[in-house]
Structure formats: C-alpha cells, structure tokens
A protein has these predicted regions:
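Thiol-based oxidoreductase modules, predominantly thioredoxin-like and allied folds used
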Residues: 28-41
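A general structural signal for well-ordered alpha-helical segments in protein cores
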Residues: 41, 50-53, 75
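Short alpha-helical
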Residues: 13, 39, 64
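Local sequence-structure signature of Cys/Sec-based thiol-disulfide redox active-site neighborhoods
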Residues: 1-28
Length: 83
C-alpha cells in the first residue's frame, strides 16, 4: 500500500473533502496540520512548491491538492492505489 501524507488546516473545506475522498476509497493517510506552524508551512512550500492546502504527497511525491486528487479518482488511479 502507498504512503499518503495530507497537509491540512482546520479551517480548510477542501482539506475536509480530500480526507473524505481518501476515506471513501479506503486509503489510509497521515494528516499533518500546518495551521499553527509558520515554519512548517515554509517546509510545505519546499516539499510541494505551493503554499495552499490541502497538499497531498503519495510515496513522497507531491500530486497537488483536492482538484488533482479528484482527477486521480476520475481516471481510476485511486482504486489502483488501494489494490
């Protein structure tokens, strides 16, 4: 099974949607909250090239945010990850 890291904040609606989508597909993930840690948000920029949340990494590779996760679902990739 793949390792999924999900960088989120408490106030982010797209973060909630990303979590729900992963759970719907039975994909476990590690949630890393970045709301109260400016230094960690800077590290997020280094990891992904983006400041926005959610940011999702699959096996250490940044895939983007919620829109990119939905696109992977549309293409059937999420079901392959769970196999």
């Amino acid at each position: 099974m793949v390792r999924i890291e999900l960088y989120t904040t408490a106030w982010c609606g797209f973060c909630l949607r990303a979590k729900a989508l992963l759970e719907e597909h039975g994909l476990p993930y590690e949630e890393i909250r970045v709301d109260d840690d400016p230094a960690f948000r800077a590290r997020l920029l280094d990891l992904t090239g983006r400041w926005t949340v959610p940011q999702i990494l699959i096996d250490g590779e940044p895939i983007g945010g919620y829109a990119e996760l939905r696109e992977l679902e549309r293409r059937g990739v999420l079901d392959v990850l769970v196999a």
